[in-house]
Amino acid sequence: YEEVERLKHKHVDKVHLVGNPVRPEVLVLRDEDYPAFTEDGLLKVLVTGGSQGARVLSEVVPDGLAMLPPALRQRLQVTQQCRVEDLERVRERYRAHDIPAELGTYFEDMEVRLADCHLFIGRAGASTIAELTAVGRPAILIPLPIATDDHQAANTREMVKAGGARMIRQPAVTIKEVTGWDDKDNRTRVAQADAFQKLAKDISLQIQAMAMAPQTLANAAHAAWNCGRPHAARDLADLVESFGGIDLMDVIRVGGDNHQRTTETAQAAGLANQDRAA
């Protein structure tokens, strides 16, 4: 990202911004158009919470979508990743709201689903941000509140400032695990229920702000795309190469002119070490 925190001033001139490399199967989607979203067409929403899913999204996203105006709610097509223990409960919630949703604990073809969606809802890890901006997908981001140094919130800044995403804070009370039934625990449960309700409402309001007019969502997609750094892997490799001389690069580059000689030298050194050990 452009902004680097806790960096000593004397090191500012040494900073090289390359971005976060993304998978090739995601990167190829960068040149594809944002899927058409019309006044009466489907609104395809992709919801994920990282590799293990995020329980809070299972709690609040179905209810938030149900709060949308009927004209928009009836056009929803949802794909959501859930934890295995939440799957049936979330399915029942979508069924009760009469919202079509495909649920799963893991999607192997996530790049296909990312390409097909109009709007992403999820956490704000660095890899997620990199993929969203590489492809150009607008997002509602809910940073993990217990992330070290609040780094997920920091991850959202560039995308939010550009207009490619909206960020919603998850109240800390929602992550507390309550197992008892004393007065304090019951008060916490009430506070959690209120916080979940507010979070669902915030999601609904942000979706309306982005999706009630098709052009607004398309503009957000373009803004997200402009934040992408598609050449991160190449730029990082070039930067690493710039630190070394020719001999070092021959070791690093598989297939370099001296690769065979380097390999033979390493093998010979290994045999010599074996002889000494014997």
Spell out what each predicted region is.
Residues Q192-A193, A209-A278:
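C-terminal amphipathic helix plus adjacent low-complexity
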Residues D31-F120, A153-R157, K161, I168-D182, ...:
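Donor-nucleotide binding loops and adjacent catalytic segments primarily
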Residues E2-K8, R89, T128-I129, D149-T156:
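Short, glycine/polar-rich helix-capping loops at beta-to-alpha or helix-loop-helix junctions
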Residues G104, R123, L141-I142:
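A short structural motif in glycosyltransferase catalytic domains
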Residues V4-V15, R89-A96, R113, L132:
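Short loop/helix-cap segments at secondary-structure boundaries that form the rim of catalytic
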Residues E25, A162, R166-P230, S242:
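Leloir-type glycosyltransferase catalytic cores
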Residues A115-A130, R137-P138:
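Acidic donor-binding loop of glycosyltransferase active sites
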Residues Y1-L29:
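Active-site-proximal region of nucleotide-activated glycan assembly enzymes
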